[in-house]
Amino acid sequence: MNEPGVQVLKSGGVGVLLTDTLYGLVGSALNKKTVGRIYRIKGRNNKKPLIILISAIEDLKLFGIEHDGKTEKILKKFWPGPVSIIMPCAKKRFEYLHRGTQTLAFRLPAKKTLVKILKHTGPLVAPSANPEGLPPASTIQEAKKYFGDKVDFYGRGGVPKAKPSTIINITDNKVRIIRK
């Protein structure tokens, strides 16, 4: 795969990519050091978990998340698409991701090029590409102004949808909208 940054991401690097919603500051969700680096680069509150992009529903198993038929129906109703779904994950080894909330938010994007990248890299954390408290970058140039050489690569440009994902919570088998 020739997409810029795939090898960098596979080896624990951090970059900026256009996701299905906004530009994201991305890195491997399965690499604790990478996730910590993203928190530092972004200046993000350590208590706020990150959204994880996945390439298929089966990727949830990587995080120890099993789901029943009812949950599967909910997932298939909203995915693929710009909806992040909060699910229970009390696994201690993923504390660096859930930050004590014992839940994780996942999104399976509809953007085919992004899903192709995810198939090669594995799940990625992808908070918006901006320092905490500032507006999300709307161009690669803006992201470069924010992060300069603190990241390992910048992906190809493009026009973001300019709206963050909807977030729903299904931890109690009910669909609750957290952010629309």
What are these regions (language model features)?
Residues 1-180:
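Active-site-adjacent structural elements in enzyme catalytic cores
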